[in-house]
A protein has these predicted regions:
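Extended, folded cores of ATP/NTP-driven motor/assembly subunits in large transport
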Residues: 1-378
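P-loop NTPase motor domains
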Residues: 23, 30-49, 60, 223-225, ...
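Hydrophobic anchor at the beta1->P-loop junction of P-loop NTPases
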Residues: 415
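Conserved lysine of the Walker
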Residues: 423
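Hydrophobic positions on the alpha1 helix immediately C-terminal to the Walker A/P-loop
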Residues: 426
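Short beta-strand-centered segment that lines the nucleotide-binding/catalytic pocket of NTP-utilizing
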Residues: 439-453, 467-468
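Structural recognition of the conserved hydrophobic beta-strand(s) that form the central parallel beta-sheet
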Residues: 443-446, 595, 634, 658, ...
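Conserved AAA+ ATPase "SRH/arginine-finger" region at the nucleotide-binding site
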Residues: 465-472, 690-699
Length: 761
């Protein structure tokens, strides 16, 4: 083995390995399945007779400690340790439901004959580049393994009983006099009996699959890989030279024709009809001619396939059970599983991803017959990062879904679903998880329905209740100043330009009118904004922060009649009955978790309130950016923001701008149609790499199917689905999920929005 990943397996054979990820084949609609199948056929046809390749599917048991570490939430010695333990317990229970105890990996190993490494290397690298491009066309993520990584894979296979970390360095070889084999070999091998072997403390047995079925099924390989025990499935494939393949088939047809003539002669001599010949002869003749036609005119090649399965276990009885289960799957598809007799050592070596086949049991198959063993089933989303959050379990495999939105190119997100499908609950679960795990992240919620207060109070956050009377939950004054300005408000040196844009949006919302503000009115407002912020920018003290009243007075001081018109429109919000936003901010907007409850603002103030909250959040995002902190922003009833042009355009700006500033906005809505109300608002969809889609109404399903290219089969997961069930879109991955949160917990009681449960809590 060399550091670049090239391995010499015989004196003249050199191999390399590529690891590739899964794609959603089983979840795809039939047209997509056909497209993947045809693309896989083209992939196989790339290999000529000089390149032998091996498809390896390695399902190994991982220690529960490995997964437990991934989902653990260590106590911090504060008042939240109780809910940390509760949430961690829920994750442990969900982990036990799935088969996350298995780590599933897929490899393609290819090899060529060459006189030496210098001759082999350029050709192997050229083949590797071509294969990576072919994987890319399939939409499959793939990467070549270097020497260390290949040794690591074989270490995990050969020492699966130890589950110890792989320790190796190329620098250790020369001083120690050891070879790479010494670092991957198990403590012992034992091949005493002809039908099984012992490898360290593990028992194993290699069998080969006899393909007897006249027709093969694309589920067969998937069923082998769905077994809940450690198993290694290997397909060694050797392409046959096309000219030789055609010659061989023609020779076989000639032999069959010769036999047919002999049978006809016998018939004539015996005095019966010469068309009556053995049925097998007629069948073989027709099949051979069809095979010749496929090879000559249907882009089919001939391959020799060796199909090996390695089962392992801790005890002989368990091994027999695993082999019996494997054999049952083979029989289900009219194939036979046969144990290798006195070839177990060769079988084990052939089961390692080395590209070396020592088992001379081969079956000739055409391209489409080999391709029916489609190496794709369903994707998994289980990230080991310290900030990966829980989003349910994979409905196809029952495995945990743990992902970190920060790893996406665009972490902006949407939570979509009909009333009662679990939208707000899903948002609260993510908020809680982020609060408990992502210790540096700040969380801000825009809450138009007053649903988040119990959770925020349990997390000791700040609930800012905005109402026309200006009174908070405890009756004390509660004010937010829309004129608040942070000096880091903009990318450039002039934060006032961006603040002026917000105030223009605010005035446009207040003044109203079908056509919005006229150019003259915009100019006047911009002029006044610069006047009222002059003192604060010269001396940025809190008491110098302007109020809406200062803008009103500046407008009154202007000569233009348009200024008087705007000032009059502002009057009700300054000296009138809706003057709740004409005060200095007097609440703590810097708490780690802040909820803006705007339920009681009323129809006149709610739109303005939502816009003011947006601006307050932007202030917080700019402060956090300087402190290298992430700001998670949740906008419930998001459709309310999209109904007005001003708040909609400001929301679109959030979706475009937040990523660069360390913000992660999440819109929560039941009205998908509002998300597509204009081309501008449609950008929110295009700038969201995370979509948590729960049950959808019929009309919305069709819109989403078209917008997100969802297949009918995928759509079934959001059709009349239960609470907490649906589809997760994470980057290019689509997974069906189920999230049933345990109801007998404190967290459930503070997160539920069901009236009867809220009342009882």
């Amino acid at each position: 083995m060399w550091p670049d990943g090239i391995c010499r397996v015989t004196n003249t054979r050199y191999t390399k390995t590529i690891q590739y990820q899964d794609i959603n084949y089983q979840l795809s609609q039939n047209e997509d399945k056909t497209a993947i199948f045809e693309a896989w056929c083209d992939f196989l046809n790339y290999f000529d007779s000089s390149v032998q390749f091996q498809l390896s599917f390695v399902n190994l048991s991982a220690s529960q400690e490995t997964f437990a570490r991934s989902i653990s939430i260590p106590p911090c010695g504060d008042e939240f340790d109780g809910i940390r333990a509760e949430y961690a317990g829920m994750l442990q229970n969900q982990l036990a439901r799935g088969n996350n105890g298995l780590i599933k990996t897929k490899y393609l190993t290819f090899g060529i004959e060459a006189d030496n490494l210098r001759a082999a290397k350029p050709r192997l690298e050229r083949i590797e580049t071509d294969l990576l491009n072919n994987f890319k066309r399939l939409g499959v993520v793939a990467a070549p393994l270097n020497g260390f990584e290949r040794l690591h894979v074989m270490h995990d296979i050969l020492r699966m009983d130890e589950q110890e970390p792989f320790r190796f360095s190329w620098d250790w070889l020369a001083p120690s006099g050891l070879s790479t084999k010494d670092f991957i070999a198990p403590s012992s091998f034992e091949f005493k009996t002809g039908r099984q072997f012992r490898m360290g403390k593990k028992l194993g047995a290699v069998s080969f699959v006899q393909i007897l079925a006249p027709e093969l099924n694309d589920r067969m390989l998937a069923d082998f890989l769905d077994m809940e025990s450690s198993v290694l499935v290997n397909l060694h494939v050797q392409s046959v030279d096309q000219v030789n393949a055609i010659k061989t088939v023609k020779r076989k047809i000639t032999d069959l024709d010769k036999s047919k003539i002999e049978e006809q002669k016998k018939a004539v001599r015996a005095g019966y009809d010469m068309d009556i010949i053995p049925s097998d002869l007629a069948t073989y003749g027709a099949e051979a001619k069809k095979l010749l036609q496929d090879l000559q005119s249907r882009n089919e090649r001939m391959f020799l396939l060796t199909f090996l399965i390695l089962n392992t276990a801790d005890t002989p009885r368990q091994l027999d059970n695993n082999i019996f289960q494997t054999s049952s799957i083979a029989q289900k598809y009219n194939c036979a599983l046969t144990r290798l007799d006195f070839q177990q050592e060769e079988g084990l070596m052939s089961s390692l991803p080395l590209g070396l086949n020592q088992i001379e049991i081969q079956r000739g198959l055409t391209t489409s017959s080999v391709a029916i063993f489609v190496p794709f089933t369903t994707q998994e989303l289980f990230q080991n990062g310290s900030e990966a959050l829980y989003y349910g379990i994979n409905a196809l495999s029952n495995n945990l879904i743990m992902v970190d939105r920060k790893l996406l190119k665009n972490p902006n997100g949407l939570i979509l679903g009909t009333p009662g499908s679990g939208k707000s609950f899903s948002a609260k679960r993510e908020i809680t998880n982020a609060f408990l795990i992502c210790s540096k992240d700040d969380i801000i919620i825009c809450d138009p329905e007053g649903e988040y207060t119990p959770l925020v109070e349990r997390l000791h956050g700040q609930v800012i209740k905005l109402s026309p009377t200006g009174k908070g939950y405890d009756g004390s004054p509660c004010y937010i100043n829309p004129m608040d300005l942070n000096l880091d408000y903009s990318d450039d040196d002039n934060p006032l330009s961006l603040k002026s844009d917000f105030i223009l949006s605010l005035c446009e919302l207040i003044v109203g009118g079908k056509d919005g503000l006229a150019p003259v009115e915009k100019t006047i407002i911009d002029r006044c904004v610069r006047i009222v912020y002059r003192d604060y920018l010269n001396d940025p003290k809190p008491e110098n922060m302007p109020l809406l009243e200062d803008l009103y007075n500046a407008l009154r001081a202007q000569d233009e009649k348009e200024a008087q018109y705007i000032a009059t429109a502002l009057e009700i919000y300054v000296t009138g009955s809706l003057n709740v936003f004409n005060h200095h901010t007097n609440v703590d907007v810097n708490s780690r978790i802040v909820c803006y409850d705007i339920k009681e603002l009323g129809k006149q103030l709610k739109k303005i309130g939502m816009l003011v909250v947006q601006d307050q959040v932007w202030n917080r995002v700019t402060i956090n950016r300087a402190a290298h902190k992430t700001t998670r922003y949740y906008l419930d009833e998001f459709h309310l923001l999209l109904k007005e042009e001003q708040t909609a355009s400001y929301s679109v700006e959030i979706w475009k701008r937040y990523r660069k500033w360390g913000g992660i906005p999440t819109g929560i809505t039941q009205n998908v149609k509002d998300l597509l109300s204009s081309r501008e608002v449609e950008n929110i969809f295009e700038n969201s790499d995370f979509i948590y889609m729960l049950n959808q109404a019929a009309g919305d399903r069709q819109i989403l199917a078209k917008q997100l290219n969802i297949s009918p089969h995928q759509l079934s997961y959001v059709t009349h689905s239960g609470e907490g069930e649906g589809l997760l879109f994470y980057g290019n991955t689509i997974l069906p999920f189920i999230d049933h949160f345990p109801k007998d917990t404190e967290l459930y009681r503070v997160m539920t929005t069901k009236p009867q449960e809220v009342a009882s809590a």
